[in-house]
């Protein structure tokens, strides 16, 4: 028979021994050392080193500020995103599931104006040829 309301004790915490073992999370204290684990910074991929290398090829004695580098990095990301989006649309129009160099080339011609598109296509073709010959 269940105990009466007056006989019931208030709810207490369960004994420690009966608890399920807890998983250790990053940032919590470890049992052995008592120190917190260091959290690693989230890596941000940028084109800064590549932009800097090109700058030094063109103008060896010229530097660049962090703000200018940030602007150029945003510019490169924007152009890549536009080219990728356009190439994706072209592949979808042609009912293909793979973006090839042809779609990239066509999207560059559509996005970049006149002479800039011609130079970009020729440099891209040169880079693909160089890569293809080095992997053989």
From Swiss-Prot:
Crosslinked positions for Glycyl lysine isopeptide (Lys-Gly) (interchain with G-Cter in SUMO)? 8-9, 23-24
Annotated spans, Disordered: 1-44
Q: Where is this cross-link: Glycyl lysine isopeptide (Lys-Gly) (interchain with G-Cter in ubiquitin)?
A: 130
Post-translational modification remark: Monoubiquitinated to form H2BK123ub1. H2BK123ub1 gives a specific tag for epigenetic transcriptional activation and is also prerequisite for H3K4me and H3K79me formation. H2BK123ub1 also modulates the formation of double-strand breaks during meiosis and is a prerequisite for DNA-damage checkpoint activation.
Subunit info?
A: The nucleosome is a histone octamer containing two molecules each of H2A, H2B, H3 and H4 assembled in one H3-H4 heterotetramer and two H2A-H2B heterodimers. The octamer wraps approximately 147 bp of DNA.
Role according to the record:
Core component of nucleosome. Nucleosomes wrap and compact DNA into chromatin, limiting DNA accessibility to the cellular machineries which require DNA as a template. Histones thereby play a central role in transcription regulation, DNA repair, DNA replication and chromosomal stability. DNA accessibility is regulated via a complex set of post-translational modifications of histones, also called histone code, and nucleosome remodeling.
The protein's predominant localisation is: nucleus
* Subcellular localization(s) per the UniProt record: Nucleus; Chromosome
Q: Which residues carry this modification: N6-acetyllysine?
A: 8-9, 13, 23
GO MF, one annotated term: structural constituent of chromatin
Mind listing the UniProt keywords for this protein, alphabetically? Answer: Acetylation, Chromosome, DNA-binding, Isopeptide bond, Nucleosome core, Nucleus, Ubl conjugation
**Which Gene3D superfamilies has this protein been placed in?**
Histone, subunit A (1.10.20.10)
Q: Which family, according to the similarity comment?
A: Belongs to the histone H2B family.
Under CDD domains, the record lists: HFD_H2B
Q: Does the entry annotate any disulfide bonds, and if so which pairs?
A: none
Q: Which SMART domains does this UniProt record tie to the protein?
A: H2B
Against InterPro entries, the record matches this protein to: Histone-fold, Histone_H2A/H2B/H3, Histone_H2B, HISTONE_H2B_site
Name-wise, this protein is Histone H2B
Residue spans of biased composition, Basic and acidic residues class: 1-10
SUPFAM superfamilies the UniProt entry points to: Histone-fold (SSF47113)
